Amino acid sequence: MPDREIKSPIWHPEPGTVEDVFDHTYKEKEGPKPPTVIVWRNVILMSLLHLGALYGLFLFPSARALTWIWFFGCLLFSALGITAGAHRLWSHRSYKASLPLQIFLALGNSMAFQNDIYEWSRDHRVHHKYSETDADPHNAVRGFFFSHVGWLLVRKHPDVIEKGRKLELSDLKADKVVMFQRRFYKPSVLLMCFFVPTFVPWYVWGESLWVAYFVPALLRYALVLNATWLVNSAAHMWGNRPYDSSINPRENRFVTFSAIGEGFHNYHHTFPFDYATSEFGCKLNLTTCCFIDLMCFLGLAREPKRVSREAVLARAQRTGDGSHWSG
């Protein structure tokens, strides 16, 4: 696809790199670990959300067919707000997006309600730079529950806060879409995560307000949350490591399916700037094949970064666990 002029008002220049490469110089502080402080408000809210989601699952068979379609549409839209938006576009700058596409992804991100783009991207860059150390927000060394959801139920480790403050985030601060969403995040969440998913089926085709709230809003929200969390937990514990056997992130097919392409995690932590997050392009990778590649074809995205096949094979042979298809 031919390159577009940066001068065009819908295109914005992006920095070539971001701080998402593991920092081997970091050393955890000696001595006792700081006490774990439970945030009871978060515990209560997460518990209520999942109880509501279970009730939504019970109500799901009674929903109208249009509500099922709406449910899956909202699920995909909010998931893309994380995978194609907060993750691959804003955290890693692995491709460039036009202003309309940025706005679309920011709205999907608000529907996903997993912290605003700025905070999500900051924490994700810290996760990559200090993976599985005290400075990692969802350090998998602390166990499945902590890396899955527990990290959101307690105060952050002091090193997470310290390293997050020192991270270079000028690209995010200069991004008008990111900062606009951050400024109006709470009303955007109320609108996109709860009001729109509930109002549309109730008003447009007469779905029960009860079903409209518990199925497209709460159940959908909880499913996307847990799909994202599985990348932090399961994909750091179970699977093979064909590219770098010295790190914990794994290739996990179940996570790949549930998180629409985010389960090729050993590859992703080895080559974090690759827009596909996988050696295999479209295989089990809805975010890459059906969305980012389509956006590039339509001219709404451009310059997707990719690792050469030669570099991938060389790295797999040098540091992989021997499970790579090339042997």
UniProtKB/Swiss-Prot annotation:
Cofactor list: Fe(2+)
Reactions performed catalytically: octadecanoyl-CoA + 2 Fe(II)-[cytochrome b5] + O2 + 2 H(+) = (9Z)-octadecenoyl-CoA + 2 Fe(III)-[cytochrome b5] + 2 H2O
Cofactor binding annotation: Expected to bind 2 Fe(2+) ions per subunit.
Motif Histidine box-2 in this chain: 124-128
Cytoplasmic-side segments: 1-39, 86-184, 231-327
Membrane-related topology note: Multi-pass membrane protein
Single biological process term from Gene Ontology: response to fatty acid
Subcellular localization(s) per the UniProt record: Endoplasmic reticulum membrane
Ranges of the Lumenal topological domain: 61-64, 205-208
Residues involved in Fe cation 1 binding: H87, H92, H124, H128, H268
EC number: 1.14.19.1
Domain of life where this protein originates: Eukaryota
Keyword DNA damage applies: no
Annotated domain remarks: The histidine box domains are involved in binding the catalytic metal ions.
Protein name: Acyl-CoA desaturase
Species name: Cyprinus carpio
